[in-house]
Amino acid sequence: MPPGVELSEVQGNVLHAYGADFPCARFVRLRLASQARAGEAATVVAGWLREVSFGRRPKGLPERDRLTPHLNLAFTAGGLTALGVPTTLLHEFPPEFRAGAKARAAALGDRWPDERPFTESHLLLSVHATGHAACERRVRELLEGNAAAGGPLEVVQERAAGDEGGGREPFGFADGGSQPAVEGVDLDPVGDGVYAARTAPAGRLRQRAEDLGIVQAKRDWRLVRTGEFLLGHAGEDGAAAPGPSAPLGPNGTFMVYRELDQDVHGFADYVAEQARRVGMPARELQEKIVGRRREDGSTLVRPAEDFPQPAPAQSARERNGRRRRSNDFLYTADPQGYRCPLGAHVRRTNPRDALPGGGERTMRHRIIRRGMRYAPPDEGLVFVCYAASIENGFEFIQRYWINDGAALGLGAAPDFMLQQAGEAGRPTGHMVIPGYRPVVLPPPDRPFVTVRGCEYLFVPSRRACAWLAGLHAAS
C-alpha cells in the first residue's frame, strides 16, 4: 500500500462502493436561506458532519451497522464560501471547481433545459440505505434538525434514486461493471488497472502465454495511482493534483453530480425502426450502440461463451471475479471495431489501449463512477463520479472523448448515445457499425439522453470534516 493512504479517512462510496448492500439513495441539494444566517447554517452542518460515513466495507461491519443508512456530504465552492472557509484556502482550489458546473456547461456541450431550472446549491447531502423507506426516514430526521434551528438551510431539490431490484440503468443494461483498480485499495489490476505491455514476456515465453490464453497476465497490468482519485497523493504523472492544503485537502476528492434524463421509449422506437431497416435484431443493434451485452454487461470484444451465466446464489467474491474477467480485454484485439464498433459508447468513455500511447495515457483520465437510476416513475440516471481533478477527469472525457471523436479517429463525431441537441434543436451525429456491409445509423430526432443539470462538489476527508465542523466555533 502506498505510504499515507488512510482508507478510513475517505468518505464512504468513494473508494469502496455501497453497491448492492445499499441499493437505494436520496440526494438532497441545499443552500443557505440568507448569508445573514450563515452561523445558524454552520451549526446545523457541523452536526451533520459528525455523522458522515467513511471508508468501511459493509461486509466488515456489525449486523446492526450494515442496516444503518449512510450519510455523506459534499460542498460546492459557494457552499465553502458561505460556511466561512478562509479566502486563502478557497484560492487553493482549482479554477474549474471555483467556477462551478454552470459556468463550465457551454464548454462541455451542455444545454440544460429551461423548464424546471437546475438551481445551484451550496451542499449535497446523500443518504444510502437498504430501501427507499429507510432513506426517506433518515433524510427527514436530518432535515428536522434544520427545521428546529429555524430553517437556515433551504432544500433546493430532493432526488430519490436506486433500485431495490438492483443494477440496471433505464435502457436495460447492467451498469457500473467497470471501475478503476486503485493502488492501495484493490489487489487485482487485471482488466481495470493500467495495461503496460512492455512488461510482458517476449519470444517463445510470450508465444506460450498466447497459446495458453493468458496474454493479459497479471504481470501485464498494474494498479492506477491513488492520486488520480485522492488529493495529496501522487498520480500517474508522479505529482499530486492541485488542491487545498491541510487540513482541508488531503484524502479529499472532487465529485461531479449530474442528472441525466433518459428517453427510454424514444431509444426503443429508434432501435426498432433502424433494426427493421438494416435487417438486424433490435437487441443486437442496441448492444452495438452501447458496446456491451445487455444481459450481463460483458464486452463485445470477447465471445459470449467466455462469460457463462452466473449461478443465482453467487457469492460477492464470485460476482467480483466475474466482473474482473468481463473487463479483461484490450481494444487492440478488435482494431477495426467489427465486434465492438469504434463509436460504441463504452469505447468513447474509456478507450483503454486504443489511444496512441496505450492504456497508460487513458489512465490519466479515469474516474470512479457511482451512478444510480432515478427512482420510479422518473426515467434517468443520477451520474456521480469522483476524481482528484475535475478538469483532467470528467471534463477531459466529456470534451475530448464524448463530444469529439478526433482522438479516436472518428473526426468530430460525438458519442452517438450521449449526443445533445445541436444548434438546430436536434442531434446531428451518425454512427457507423463496421462489417462486410457497414451500417450507418442516422441521427435520432431527439437526444436519447438529456442533461438536466450538474454540480461540482468537494468531498472532504474525516479530518477535513472535523475541521469544517469546528470552523464556526473557532471564528
Model-derived regions: residue spans:
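Long, low-complexity, Ser/Thr/Gly/Pro-rich intrinsically disordered segments that act as flexible linkers
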Residues: M1-S475
